[in-house]
């Protein structure tokens, strides 16, 4: 999960966007987006799809850490 959260933050920062900018793109508050990045709230698939398009990366790239179990194999 840590890689997933770090990747969300890194993608945002690599695109020179603030949390408020991304929240606006997603139609949510900055507080909610901050909770996504810190792992306090589950990010909906719809928002992940929007972010993958915004950042021009695959959904798999964003969620890679989440889709592996502790043995490193995909679910």
Residue ranges and their predicted role:
Residues 40-50, 71:
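Short, basic-rich loop-to-helix N-cap that marks the start of a DNA-contacting helix
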Residues 46-61:
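DNA major-groove recognition helix of helix-turn-helix/homeodomain DNA-binding modules
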Residues 26-42:
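Recognition helix of helix-turn-helix/homeodomain-like DNA-binding domains
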Residues 8, 22-23, 33-36, 62:
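Conserved hydrophobic/aromatic packing and binding residues within compact polymer-binding modules
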Residues 6-21, 25, 50:
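Short basic helix-loop element that most often maps to the first helix and adjoining turn
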Residues 53, 63-75:
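Short, charged recognition helix plus adjacent turn
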């Amino acid at each position: 999960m840590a890689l997933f959260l770090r990747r969300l933050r890194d993608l945002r920062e690599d695109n020179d966007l603030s949390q408020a900018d991304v929240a606006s793109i997603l139609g949510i508050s900055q507080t909610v987006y901050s909770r996504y990045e810190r792992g306090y709230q589950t990010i909906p698939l719809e928002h992940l799809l929007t972010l993958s398009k915004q950042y021009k990366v695959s959904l798999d790239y964003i969620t890679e850490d989440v889709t592996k179990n502790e043995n490193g194999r995909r679910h």
